[in-house]
A protein has these predicted regions:
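Hydrophobic alpha-helical transmembrane segments
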Residues: 17-22, 46, 72-76, 134
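Internal/C-terminal transmembrane anchor helices
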Residues: 125-152
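Membrane-embedded alpha-helical segments of integral membrane proteins
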Residues: 28-124
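Short, intrinsically disordered terminal tails adjacent to the first/last structured region
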Residues: 1-5
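N-terminal membrane topogenic signal
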Residues: 7-23
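N-terminal low-complexity, Ser/Thr- and acidic-residue-enriched intrinsically disordered segments
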Residues: 71-77, 136-140, 161
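Alpha-helical transmembrane signal-anchor/signal-peptide segments
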Residues: 150-163
Length: 163
């Protein structure tokens, strides 16, 4: 007795995007918008932005419904890309914030890149969807190669300039 094999693949459930979109929207609001209206909350905004980044990573790994190779691959790509980017950014960015400036500022941008690419490519086939995530992550890291910092302002903000 044999089991009949069919060529029909089981349809994949679509990506669950709403938790990632909400996490990134909250992250950017806490990171950039709230400190504009309440300047004393700047350090809290940084911490909240990093916590929301953790929420995006947890969503992507456990709740996104993406194939496991895409889930792990995207996280590994982000880590490798930001470590590689640190080698080519201006020394003021690489050494700023006791060497943590790039990592702290990269978290919101990488989260936005991941969620935006996942949302834009969620109806595409595997190859184009992966290419969109790779392109978005590399673009997000590439932005930092165009910047330098003059230090920290009196309000505690980074003084970014174009290279």
């Amino acid at each position: 007795m044999t089991i009949a094999q069919t060529d029909e693949s089981t349809p994949r459930k679509p990506l669950r995007l709403w938790p990632g979109v909400i996490a990134v929207a909250l992250q950017w609001r806490l990171w950039f918008v709230v400190p504009v209206f309440f300047p004393e909350t700047g350090p809290h905004g940084i911490f909240a932005g990093l916590c929301a980044g953790l929420a995006v990573v947890l969503w992507w790994l456990f709740f996104s419904r993406a194939p496991w190779s895409d889930r792990v691959g995207a996280i590994v790509l982000m880590v490798v890309a930001i470590v590689a980017t640190k080698r080519v950014v201006h020394e003021s960015i690489a050494g700023g914030g006791m060497g943590m400036l790039l990592y702290i500022y990269a978290v919101p941008l990488l989260c936005l890149a991941l969620v935006a690419a996942a949302a834009a490519g969620h109806r595409r086939s595997t190859g184009p969807r992966r290419a969109m995530v790779i392109g978005a992550v590399l673009f997000a890291c590439g932005v930092f190669t165009l910047l330098r910092t003059g230090g920290i302002t009196g309000e505690g903000d980074s003084d970014f300039h174009w290279r």
